[in-house]
């Protein structure tokens, strides 16, 4: 984009510094047959790795290289039978009738440099392979939790999972330990986590699917804007197409269009797509709230005004057109609340028949349907401003909110309409 300097008639190119990385769509990674690569030490014996990891947990200095090598060694033999061909983004994972394992999802390459030294413990045996992988994968979920009470709750749940396998087991780790938090910075550990979750998400009936307790947070990581869309569909009872028609604000629409880029396998439950971050497919998710702040705020505000408690805790993004988005959200929530989709579904013989709808020439009269066209026409007739009834509805919602989190949608509603 350029402008003209009036005094000199010179052309000036108007640019701003690049403030952030561009989002990477998952399909882009696989162009040209690119493969996901996992690097682990494949040479050390499982018995030795098991002891290294166990003693590392006991002494609170467990090395991530040992963890990765152990998880690969103990899980590489797991096999499940494919009932149908499995492929994603043109990459053939397996064919019908084939037995495959978690690491068929990636190309595994050996790290030839060897492993750091570790300590041995002869009392650790193959029996510990029943709980140790679950525990190591579970620490990923615990390590992502920053809030103390929630972290403690997760650790207690993980310990219960392991005790269900070995009743006399005593955890060598507590929620107060932090050394394993940094494992989430290791790309190979993240790929192992993603492989396990993607594999057992596909084979949900497997006895080892319990390993997903810790890995499930890898699925749709940094895809919160997609979760927002799903929540709006659920809380409003509209179809996804109907939700789209209620998007009345430009920035929200533009972000939604970017999220809906074709060919990304969003609706394929067995795709690599949900693991775009931990598999290393995308450095920056196009489905995050950071990339879609206006849509995220719009969707969560609609849900909150429709009395969703979960939406109240959603983060309030900075530097967006909050008031314009708020008005659009309020109109949608008010319209849905004023025209509930209620009609007789079953009958013992008597059925209510709706009388024919009488034509009305008064646009200022509130619509009785959920038609977005009728509501936009009505809103235009009231000068495109929230009416007293709309504001009263929002005020009632604000009145139900107590102690909202700072910088949350609930806080915004309380301050704006309370």
UniProtKB/Swiss-Prot annotation:
Pfam families: Rhabdo_ncap. It is found in: Virion; Host cytoplasm. InterPro entries: Rhabdo_ncapsid, Rhabdovirus_ncapsid_C, Rhabdovirus_ncapsid_N, Rhabdovirus_nucleoprotein-like. GO terms for molecular function: RNA binding. Keywords: Capsid protein, Helical capsid protein, Host cytoplasm, Ribonucleoprotein, RNA-binding, Viral nucleoprotein, Viral RNA replication, Virion. GO terms for cellular component: helical viral capsid; host cell cytoplasm; ribonucleoprotein complex; viral nucleocapsid. Homomultimerizes to form the nucleocapsid. Binds to viral genomic RNA. N in nucleocapsid binds the P protein and thereby positions the polymerase on the template. Interaction of N(0) with the P protein prevents the uncontrolled aggregation of N(0). Encapsidates the genome, protecting it from nucleases. The encapsidated genomic RNA is termed the NC and serves as template for transcription and replication. Nucleocapsid assembly is concomitant with replication, therefore viral replication depends on the intracellular concentration of free N, termed N(0). All replicative products are resistant to nucleases. This is Nucleoprotein. It comes from Spring viremia of carp virus (Rhabdovirus carpia). The gene is N.
